[in-house]
Design a protein with these regions (language model features):
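C-terminal membrane-anchoring or membrane-association module
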Residues: 235-253
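Selective detector of the "anchor" transmembrane alpha-helix that sits immediately C-terminal
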Residues: 221-241
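C-terminus-biased signal that marks the final domain/tail of proteins
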Residues: 1-221, 248, 252
């Protein structure tokens, strides 16, 4: 988590996305800069994942935990999810390329933007500390959740139902806390710089999405079929190799 949140702390470099805020202009593609570098945690991160595979948790019970952070994890929490969930909290599913306070992504984006643009107001790191406090609590809770999932391994439908319900309940409670943090941060900025500062942020966020990326049409069904074929072929090869070894062992005996 610390690695994916890293913004070149402890080095002689500064995050590239801080360049414009420092009055140094917009980074130019292909141009070398001795000070500003591209950090792991940057505004282009849409989601951050950590996959924690656990031998003791069978595949029928999720196989392990995926820790998910929407947007850049700089000031966002990683929530734990099992691989057998059937649905996610509504705030994850909000669509749109403009700020929307019902969206988990846009809520985190707003918090990150406020911290980045007004570092003097948030230099105490209280927001990051709150995220880490939540994560520490969930890490402790995961031990019990793992045992519950293992106990339901022979009932995969029940395991999925429980994992889904717990995941949505945790996300709902967390999103309420994120909204409180967002409002507190916005109020702090408004008190110091006026409400117009928040409107400026709205305009900047919307302007950042005026240029659309033209995606080339791609047949994802084809690549999925190819992937399944490759996986099946690999499984057959492994089976044949193991069978050959077993036969060879019997002949040696």
């Amino acid at each position: 988590m610390n690695l994916q949140r890293n913004r070149l702390e402890g080095t002689k470099y500064k995050p590239q996305d801080q360049m414009e805020l420092d009055g140094k202009g917009i980074p130019k593609k292909g141009e070398f800069d001795a000070v500003y570098k591209y950090p792991i945690s940057n505004p282009n991160v849409m989601e951050a994942h950590i996959f924690q595979l656990k031998d003791e948790v069978p595949a029928s019970a999720g196989g392990g935990t995926m820790w998910l952070s929407m947007g850049s994890p700089r000031n966002a929490p990683y929530l734990p999810y099992y691989g057998n969930i059937l649905n996610t909290y509504q705030a994850y599913q909000e669509l749109g390329d403009h700020y929307n306070d019902r969206s988990w992504y846009w809520t985190i984006s707003r918090i990150n933007d406020l911290v980045a643009k007004y570092p003097d107001l948030f230099e105490d790191g209280a927001i990051r500390t709150e995220m880490e406090r939540l994560e520490s609590q969930w890490m402790v809770e995961q031990d019990l959740s793992d045992q519950e999932q293992i106990a339901l391994a022979s009932q995969p439908e029940e395991a999925s139902k429980k994992a889904t319900e717990e995941g949505i309940a945790r996300a709902e409670k967390t999103f309420e806390r994120l909204q409180e943090i967002r409002k507190e941060a916005e109020q702090k900025v408004a008190d110091e710089h006026g409400k117009s500062a928040l409107q400026d942020l709205d305009d900047e966020e919307d302007a950042a999405y005026e240029e659309k990326i033209d995606l080339v049409d791609f047949d994802y069904d084809y690549i999925l079929a190819a992937g399944l074929f490759g996986t099946t072929l690999l499984a057959i090869v492994i089976y044949l190799i193991r069978s050959k070894k077993q036969k060879g062992g019997k002949q040696d005996d």
